[in-house]
From Swiss-Prot:
The chain crosses the membrane at residues 7-27. It comes from Anthoceros angustus. GO terms for cellular component: chloroplast thylakoid membrane; photosystem I. GO terms for biological process: photosynthesis. This is Photosystem I reaction center subunit IX. Belongs to the PsaJ family. It is found in: Plastid, Chloroplast thylakoid membrane.
């Protein structure tokens, strides 16, 4: 039961950190390449 409590307390924290990192990465990529239609042609 302790393992389940540990999992439930760490999974949301890890998901929040991961999605925050991913959102920041996508924002920086979008800031560098503002037009997404041009990106596949490079």
């Amino acid at each position: 039961m302790q393992d389940v409590k540990t999992y439930l307390s760490t999974a949301p924290v890890l998901a929040t950190l991961w999605f925050g990192f991913l959102a920041g990465l996508l924002i920086e990529i979008n800031r560098s390449f503002s037009d997404a239609l041009v990106l596949p042609f490079f």
